Amino acid sequence: MKTLGEFIVEKQHEFSQATGELTALLSAIKLGAKIIHRDINKAGLVDILGASGAENVQGEVQQKLDLFANEKLKAALKARDIVAGIASEEEDEIVVFEGCEHAKYVVLMDPLDGSSNIDVNVSVGTIFSIYRRVTPVGTPVTEEDFLQPGNKQVAAGYVVYGSSTMLVYTTGCGVHAFTYDPSLGVFCLCQERMRFPEKGKTYSINEGNYIKFPNGVKKYIKFCQEEDSSTSRPYTSRYIGSLVADFHRNLLKGGIYLYPSTASHPQGKLRLLYECNPMAFLAEQAGGKASDGKERILDIIPESLHQRRSFFVGNRHMVEDVERFIREYPDA
């Protein structure tokens, strides 16, 4: 049995930018995940379920657990003095860590993805993304350090809190998964160099919004539902409503996750920096693909911290099919 800490140290030589700081940073995220795991499992026993009454910068009602997870991760990262600052889906602006101007890294995160599912005991997750800062070390970080394209990520990953708690991450040298053993208090290696299955047979989308989807996406959904034995169709529809949970299932079983633009969200709804970029990095490292329907996610130059984007991620052949339908059936 190999722990996450042992694995990170063992694999440092494979990663050109590996430093003790990055190892400690991943350890801080691991600690934050343990705290969130503990409190999610007793959320119904303490008063951290439901809405907090506040809204985030996107105008969405924040759940109590969103704010709890955000504060715990922020505290874990700041305590190590190895992160110059963070950007979070739950923060209006970047958070600059005073006294950490010497740190080389910044972290972007969605502290609790799918938190509205907590009340009904459905899987949720934490998503994180790590970049090297671009401003001079020794000075406070600025927004410029966070507005980098996804292809500049040095590490990314997620934690899924389900029937078991798993941490999945990449540093650009494959995707590795670790299951949390609460009796020992450690994450143990369970899958090394994960890959999408050769063929995917599942599509994950909120079909309740079908009437609002672009023409190309509507055509793709019908394509998924048609019978064709040569391509193993019809595909199976599975949608949890938590990006982390849907992505994790599709990574293991093969499939595609779709969150297209709609009339109410013409640019898409998922956040480029906190959700799309880290999941795209993981997908590509696992042999998959991630796109906004026209462009590779990791090549998009971000313009703002909370920028949204359409998002299609999963098996390469399935994402390429979506792109083809979007090209062939443009909206009038």
Curated annotation (Swiss-Prot):
It catalyses: beta-D-fructose 1,6-bisphosphate + H2O = beta-D-fructose 6-phosphate + phosphate. Mg(2+) 2 binds at D110, D113, E275. It is an enzyme of class 3 (hydrolase). Binds 2 magnesium ions per subunit. Pathway: Carbohydrate biosynthesis; gluconeogenesis. GO terms for molecular function: fructose 1,6-bisphosphate 1-phosphatase activity; magnesium ion binding. The keyword Hydrolase applies. It comes from the Bacteria. Keywords: Carbohydrate metabolism, Cytoplasm, Hydrolase, Magnesium, Metal-binding. Substrate binds at D113, G114, S115, S116, N206, Y239, Y257, L258, Y259, K269. Its main location: cytoplasm. The keyword Magnesium applies. InterPro entries: FBPase_C_dom, FBPase_class-1, FBPase_N, FBPtase, Fructose_bisphosphatase_AS. Its EC number is 3.1.3.11. GO terms for biological process: fructose 1,6-bisphosphate metabolic process; fructose 6-phosphate metabolic process; fructose metabolic process; gluconeogenesis; sucrose biosynthetic process. Homotetramer. Belongs to the FBPase class 1 family. This is Fructose-1,6-bisphosphatase class 1. It comes from Salmonella arizonae (strain ATCC BAA-731 / CDC346-86 / RSK2980).
